[in-house]
Amino acid sequence: MSPSEAQQFLKENQVKYILAQFVDIHGSAKTKSVPAEHYKTVVTDGAGFAGFAIWGMGMTPNVDADYMAVGDASTLSLVPWQPGYARIACDGHTHGKPHEYDTRVVLKKQLEQITARGWTFFTGMEPEFSLLRKVEGKLLPADPGDTLSKPCYDYKGLSRARVFLERLSESLRSVGIDVYQIDHEDANGQFEINYTFTDALTSCDHYTFFKMGAAEIAAELGLICSFMPKPFSNRPGNGLHMHMSIGDGKRNLFEDKSDKHGLALSKLAYHWAAGLLKHAPALAALCCPTVNSYKRLVVGRSLTGATWAPAYICYGGNNRSGMIRSPGGRLELRLPDASCNAYLATAAVIAAGMDGVINELDPGAPQNDNLYEYSQAQLDAAGIKVLPQNLHEALLALEKDEVIRSALGPVVDEFLRLKHMEWVEYMRHVSDWEVNSYLEFF
């Protein structure tokens, strides 16, 4: 969108303010509100921020220049739930250059090796979330009647949340995000809204916009829309399954219908999958970045019969118990959860996948058994390893993964520093479970 086209767009839609928006290292949206007549400044010089005040930007309060959020003109859109406002996704710059700690910048750098081959990397995010209300300090599903022990696809649960779901879906559709289905998931108060896949950078921009809208629309209704991976201990958690493929402008390069395994996958797709499997422990840190994330990935079953989360490092066909599923002609990485920074997680996925492609790694045979029912002896016999079972294990794996660290640059060091602090803080916390179990036990 040219500057003149943008100004016309803003005028026609009576936009008064533009949200110059980027994310911190946690994937949380950060903004400044800029009067619409200063649009040109946002896409040239950028909106200025004190970088030290933002998590994970690797900046100091006494030396570094301001963090400048420079707008990507192709992302300018209305904010449907906030009349009179538009949003533009920004790349961080310092000293006139892209800021290497900005995760959108990090993703764009990883995408360069894809585009250099004449390829486009496509992703489709599947955000799961919990729609909740707070009653006397206790979190409950937004719908008091949403109490089924196995609520997946329940009509009543879906229908009674329709005010929120319709408002969010229509907001997304009005700005060109093609919502194609909505369902009630397998936990009480849990939903998923699916929208059409697109190139990886746009997909991450869409997910950020999705979270912004979901939070604000829920708040207007007196509700909480939570992307916490595991808000309830005995129910499935909130994932962010990532479907992926590579195209060359003519065809899907991940698809080969002559595949001997019957998954309709090409050699390129198998090499890519092998890279993801090789780097799975390190990917866990970036795709599942909180202490709560590993309550979702824990080995075991939930009350509904399955956690729907991949505790096992393997791939298969239409097998939802492994880390990678292939619905046919594409890969679905089931590892990420809804708390991840989509830009950083996607960048890590590209680094891992391309390692598999460059070195022609082999993922072995697909695993199509129900791994939730496997014993440890069966897992050992099949050579199937378990994903990290807590954040600390994942961080140690990331520290040792030179491929991922080298590809993503210094932002990984900053991520590790912050997340080790988070782990220590978590370990110091004395939980109600500990008090109830041990206070008078001895």
Swiss-Prot record:
UniProt key word Cell membrane: no
Catalytic activity: methylamine + L-glutamate + ATP = N(5)-methyl-L-glutamine + ADP + phosphate + H(+)
Keyword annotations of the record: ATP-binding, Ligase, Magnesium, Nucleotide-binding
Induction comment: Induced during growth on methylamine.
Record-listed E.C. numbers: 6.3.4.12
Cofactor dependence: Mg(2+)
SMART domains: Gln-synt_C
Textual note on the cofactor: No activity is detected with Mn(2+).
GO function term, MF aspect, one: glutamate-methylamine ligase activity
GS beta-grasp domain location: 13-97
Phenotype when the gene is knocked out: Fails to grow on methylamine. N(5)-methyl-L-glutamine is not detected in the intracellular pool of free amino acids from the deletion mutant.
GO term, biological process aspect, one: glutamine biosynthetic process
InterPro entries to which the protein is assigned, alphabetical: Gln_synt_N, Gln_synt_N_sf, Gln_synth/guanido_kin_cat_dom, Gln_synth_cat_dom, Gln_synth_gly_rich_site, Glutamine_synthetase_typeIII
SUPFAM superfamilies to which the protein is assigned, alphabetical: Glutamine synthetase, N-terminal domain, Glutamine synthetase/guanido kinase
Limits of the GS catalytic domain: 103-442
PROSITE patterns, per database record: GLNA_ATP, GS_BETA_GRASP, GS_CATALYTIC
PANTHER family found in the cross-reference section: GAMMA-GLUTAMYLPUTRESCINE SYNTHETASE, TYPE-1 GLUTAMINE SYNTHETASE 2
Entry function: Catalyzes the formation of N(5)-methyl-L-glutamine from glutamate and methylamine.
Family: Belongs to the glutamine synthetase family. Type 3 subfamily.
Protein's name in the database: Glutamate--methylamine ligase
Species assigned in the record: Methyloversatilis universalis (strain ATCC BAA-1314 / DSM 25237 / JCM 13912 / CCUG 52030 / FAM5)
